[in-house]
Amino acid sequence: NLRAMDIECTPYAMAYCYVTPNRAVLFIDQARVTPEAKAELEANGVTLADYDSILDVMAAETEPQTVLAESATVNYAVYQVLENNPALTVKDAADPLLAMKGVKNEVELAHLRECHLRDAVAMVRFQIELENRLAAGETLTELTVDEILHKYRSANDKFLVESFGTIAAYGGNAAMMHYHATPEDHAVLQRKGFLLVDSGATYMDGTTDITRTYPLGELTEDERLFYTWTLQCHIDIAKAVWLDYCDCHMLDTIAREPLWRHLINYRCGTGHSVSFVGNVHEGPHALNGRNTTLMRP
């Protein structure tokens, strides 16, 4: 249960882990492992090895064994070494840990609820400041939105990092998937239309990802209709009751029905699972038209 900051917006360490019935080896930059973490790992039977030694160790394995490794996600050089070692039989299959992490335990759920409450406070404070500054006639941009959100989230003593780059998209920019405003290319907020804000943070006790659409003033009739129909999609998925053989794409279909009724659709996914103090996107669950992972309570 280690955390680091090796990856932007993701509190993970760059590492490999090799697990057998008799031992577990963590390949990591040992100089960055604190004495407390090292002692805890060793007490749980985990041996540390240098990050760059993974290829040599795998090539030197002589004990006949079957190794599970997913070719789609494992580093290709590592996968090649495994395949080229005659003592190893590679089983190309999905990482079973993903399914285990996808079902949160009661402790994780309790912490997630707490961090979402604090994150909601930051969101409310952001909205109040945004409304007040716009009402005062101040010129604000998509970059200003990012700055205000960071100010309120980072003020929390459990804040670690944004869970991804904030998507603050005004008007037509919101139609671009994963749009990101830059100092060279951004929009000025106006007192009309919609502002889309897709943002989140990782705290010591959880990770958040929340999307909200704010009307900044006068709306067209189409904007009102599309907003209302999309809201109905969210209400339907929140009220959905499913059986134990229901998978992700079945729920995704339920969510889209209010829009399909009008022969329109949204091109993005309906939602996705979020890790516990980790990746903002965590498999295997994701509500879209392709995912057949079974839902679990």
What is each residue range found by the language model?
Residues 1-297:
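Active-site neighborhoods and metal-handling regions in enzymes and metal-associated proteins
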